[in-house]
């Protein structure tokens, strides 16, 4: 997928176990010109990130099998993925959750329900300037 200016669309990985939430995020991101990868749990996120090298990861913190914090820590162990921005996504909006996400290696934090205008501004800030957006 290319943007209207001909550059490749930035790839965003959505890690979310609830299908309706994944669908909504994918549709909104695709409508904004992003290429979207999807994972349903932390282990799948690690494998997909290692294989596909997304330019940004939206990581739900409450995931089956391997939670988002543990998955983030493991993703950060791969040298090629250390600089990929990871945004924690959670329904919990407390200082402890924010601190835990940052300590695990997340770059930022958004709460559910997601305000897409806020998310879009965050993506523009965190994505590399040459990523096509």
Task: Explain the meaning of each model-derived region.
Residues 33-40, 48, 110:
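Short hydrophobic/Thr-rich beta-strand motif most characteristic of the beta2 strand and flanking loop
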Residues 1-13, 117-133:
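Non-catalytic signal-transmission and effector/linker regions of two-component phosphorelay proteins
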Residues 16:
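Conserved acidic carboxylate
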Residues 23-31:
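Charged docking surfaces used in two-component/phosphorelay signaling
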Residues 52-58, 63:
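Active-site beta3 strand of CheY-like receiver
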Residues 64, 82, 94, 113:
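The feature encodes the CheY-like receiver
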């Amino acid at each position: 997928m290319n943007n209207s200016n001909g550059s490749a669309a930035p790839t965003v990985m959505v890690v979310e176990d609830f299908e309706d939430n994944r669908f909504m995020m994918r549709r909104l991101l695709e409508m904004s010109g992003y290429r979207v990868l999807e994972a349903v749990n932390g282990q799948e996120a690690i494998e997909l990130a290692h294989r596909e090298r997304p330019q940004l990861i939206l990581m739900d913190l409450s995931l089956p099998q391997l939670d988002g914090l543990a998955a983030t820590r493991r993703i950060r162990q791969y040298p090629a993925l250390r600089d990929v921005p990871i945004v924690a996504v959670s329904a919990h909006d407390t200082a402890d959750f924010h601190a835990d996400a940052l300590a695990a290696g997340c770059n930022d934090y958004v709460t559910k329900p997601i305000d897409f205008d806020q998310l879009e501004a965050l993506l523009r800030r965190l994505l590399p300037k040459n990523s096509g957006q």
